[in-house]
Amino acid sequence: MDYTLTRIDPNGENDRYPLQKQEIVADPLEQHVHRSVYMGKLEHALHDMVNWGRKNSLWPYNFGLSCCYVEMATSFTAVHDVARFGAEVLRASPRQADFMVVAGTCFTKMAPVIQRLYDQMLEPKWVISMGACANSGGMYDIYSVVQGVDKFIPVDVYIPGCPPRPEAYMQALLLLQESIGKERRPLSWVVGDQGVYRANMQSERERKHGERIAVKNLRTPDEV
């Protein structure tokens, strides 16, 4: 069996992921506020309530590939207690999960499996890429390793590290919760492509750049 990979073009017309065309637009709630103050406030409160329930009840899909999954599993222990964020309910079926954590090295033969499992997840769904191997292939710049899972599925949060610590995984959960809290999804019962507004989140590298540049006294290797 032959496997092929296709790079994602967010603005492409014939791309499978994402199903809708992505473009930077204004928050649709602003239009409702100017149109009707009462209905705008009511819809804003309804969106906040729905997003609050979604972001505080994230069920991860139990899917690990290599050593990064060990660090992810460590976050479920009593020391870290990821249950504080409502993400302790591991699901063995993609149809019952809210987000997938691709933790570890993604090989070429594994890519179609991950893509199929992603298709089986129900909306709304999110993806976290955990570790250098999942982000960009890591040290494995070879023919059998995919150079980043974002080549065939959309990724919402990237976790750097080889492997990242459990604290990094919990920080990714907080960033994902913050992003979900700013989303605007259709509230009707109609199933279909109705458009999803996602906030343009600033990366942690850009957010902390000024603080890191301002540091004058660097720690010695013994103090790190």
UniProtKB/Swiss-Prot annotation:
One of the record's GO molecular function terms: quinone binding
Gene Ontology CC terms: plasma membrane; respiratory chain complex I
Membrane topology: Peripheral membrane protein
Documented EC number(s): 7.1.1.-
Catalysed reactions, semicolon-separated: a quinone + NADH + 5 H(+)(in) = a quinol + NAD(+) + 4 H(+)(out)
Residues binding [4Fe-4S] cluster, per UniProt: C67, C68, C133, C162
Any one Gene Ontology BP term: electron transport coupled proton transport
Record's subunit section: NDH-1 is composed of 13 different subunits. Subunits NuoB, CD, E, F, and G constitute the peripheral sector of the complex.
Protein name, UniProt field: NADH-quinone oxidoreductase subunit B
Classification of source organism: Bacteria, Pseudomonadati, Pseudomonadota, Gammaproteobacteria, Enterobacterales
Gene: nuoB
